[in-house]
Amino acid sequence: MPYHVTRFRGEQRKSKPRNNQTLQKPNGAISPRVRKVGGERFAIICVDPAKHRSDWMMADYFGNLLIGPQTLQHRGASFKLAVELIRQAQQKHDIQDTIVVVERTGNYHLPPKRAFASAGFETRVIHPFATKQYRVPADPGNKTDETDLYAQHRAAVAGFGLCELELEPPYRELQLRARHRRNLVEKAAAMACQIREHLHLGMPGYANLFDRLFESPTALVIAARCDSPAKLIELGQAGLSQYLHEDQIRHQIRTIDKVLAWAAQAVSDPILDGPMHHAIWTDLHELYQHFHRQTAALERELAGDLVQTPYVRLLAIPGINVVSAAELAAEMGPIAQYANANAITGRSGLYPSRHQSDQTDHNSGPIIRQANRRLRCVLMRIADNLACHCNYYRGQADVDESRGVDKRAARVKIAKRFSRLVLACVAGDEPMRHPCFQKPDSILEKLRRFHHEHQTPTDLLLADLEVAVGQLPYNTCNHEAEIVADVLQQHTHRRRGAGPIGDVLPAVLARLNIRATEANKNGDRS
């Protein structure tokens, strides 16, 4: 078996004593630095951004104003002037340590954040919720830019100015492409509903003739040719068949007969503005096809980014495809940022809310609302896929269903279990013996099929497969080499020969054999 792990049940983890506890958030604590230089020598620069300008001020740790609130235009010259004022204030008041705190406001906070960071200042981000909580008690009913700046200072002193880790390549590109693809998919899904609606208004009941309307090669082509049932009957079987032949669309006569049978029944239905609805849905369908082509191109690029990360190992799990693994890698970022699996579910908010006061304790409420929703959506989509396509998680879902567990709660349980598996699979190189890996999928074969479906050029396919080999654990190389050799042999024995794949797989197989040999020399288990 290619995946296995040795468990030591007798060993118990020794919990380290947590003597140095702090009430501040770990990535927002500034107390040690303030203690080192003194509160009068520690400055906090607060920035309240808008679209074209920001308000900012500078004060020491104790709240003494060093630079009063003023407006900063989002221009290079204005940023340089603000930096110069800060430098002068640092010299005048003997400031030895400084941080810049910028309130998160959509994307409007990015220009001042990057400008101060490029000037050499440590730049942190504060959430608007924290600003509000520190503004309302001090200035109830009075929300201005100035009161917001004062509240930001109080929140930063309390440790809510948080350091954010910048994503490095390829995670930055992967995140932008994955979010762009998801946006296109959502827009295409909404557009598909509009197409169905206008198609139904122009040709009632036509869409019900096909199980998969948009995947059928003939359904929308025939509907685009005729804007009414009467015109379908006028063309007849011979006319429709000739039209499809001219467009080089493969079809069956029984499909045309089914359409004509529907047209004979619908020809007497009262249809209002049929030609207008036909023109609308055909225009929408052209845009839908453009979205579909762009999505396919982005997916090819996502695969190229995914193979540069260890998240490609997740393809060995049945139910995980290239797009799912790429979206997870995009939203999680480098796995080294997570100390344990609870950090993953904590960031995604996959844990119940709690309300406790005195002897009242409601500790099993709904999952929390304030969380990283993008990461949560990715994990829940993967949980749906695992419940359908992975035997292990499908069995757990069936058990929960038999017990009457809510389907949403069952999916959350699967997502939490999967997060532990992600950490073990991506962060470490140890062999895995999770039930998911009893019959693992081939990572390279999944990638090859994905690129075959997306019609990726051979040179890009070879490059992605070779990069993916470098991400594989040593213990999986022999297993992958066997599958690659088997696929190559099957294609070689075909009448048409190996084709383009015969130029790709030998190089990949050689790379796998080299890694397997290195593993044996190093004494790794396979």
Q: What do these predicted ranges mean?
A:
Residues 2-526:
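A detector of single, family-specific signature residues
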